[in-house]
């Protein structure tokens, strides 16, 4: 979370908040796993905020946000049983993953669970492109909030990025 790749994790938290608000009262509420202790705490807080925004505070269970493992492979080993055993309806993978994420997508495929995935790691993007039903390629990971209409700040950030790109292009010319 505190590394240079923490932005992908923060984008994943924004997606988690959006999904929690919309699915908190369903028969299959969200379950979130994290591969970093600080991110696991933020995951629990994001889940709680999503339940509060949906006026479903009484349905929130702190155990639905968890640390599945602090290293890449221990994270995958802890996330695979969640997909397989906890009766999830969709598998959303957003954050800083390596190619080992293929093991989670395989577990989802075996459980007939659709996968949406996005990461900032190029080899993992290639894996998700091949294995996920809905891969997010490149900066789509960071634009996912705007795609879903999660708020005006997401749309504004994309507009600012586009303006800065055009200014950089004009400067280079």
Predicted regions and their residues:
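Histidine-anchored nucleotide/phosphate-binding helix
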Residues: 9-27
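C-terminal functional extensions of proteins
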Residues: 123-125, 129-173
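Well-ordered alpha-helical segments embedded in enzymatic catalytic cores
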Residues: 15-18, 75-78, 143
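Long, charge-patterned amphipathic alpha-helical coiled-coil/hairpin "stalk" segments used as oligomerization
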Residues: 68-133
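Elongated extramembrane "stalk/tether" segments
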Residues: 9-10, 14, 53, 72, ...
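Short, glycine/charged-enriched secondary-structure capping and boundary segments
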Residues: 11-13, 45-48, 105-109
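Long, charge-dense
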Residues: 22-24, 28-76
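Gly/Ser/Thr-rich loops at beta-strand to alpha-helix junctions
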Residues: 2-10, 36-40, 94-101, 122
């Amino acid at each position: 979370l505190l590394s240079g790749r923490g932005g992908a994790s923060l984008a994943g938290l924004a997606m988690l908040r959006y999904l929690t608000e919309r699915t908190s009262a369903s028969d299959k509420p969200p379950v979130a796993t994290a591969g970093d202790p600080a991110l696991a705490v933020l995951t629990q807080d994001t889940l709680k905020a999503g339940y509060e925004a949906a006026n479903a505070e009484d349905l929130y269970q702190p155990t639905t946000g968890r640390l599945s493992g602090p290293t890449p492979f221990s994270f995958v080993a802890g996330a695979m049983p969640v997909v397989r055993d906890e009766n999830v309806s969709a598998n959303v993978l957003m954050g800083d993953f390596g190619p080992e994420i293929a093991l989670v997508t395989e577990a989802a495929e075996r459980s007939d669970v659709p996968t949406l995935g996005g990461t900032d790691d190029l080899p993992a993007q290639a894996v998700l492109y091949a294995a996920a039903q809905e891969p997010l390629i490149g900066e789509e990971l960071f634009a996912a909030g705007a795609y879903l209409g999660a708020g005006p700040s997401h749309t504004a950030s994309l507009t600012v990025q586009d303006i800065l790109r055009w200014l950089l292009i004009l400067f280079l010319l």
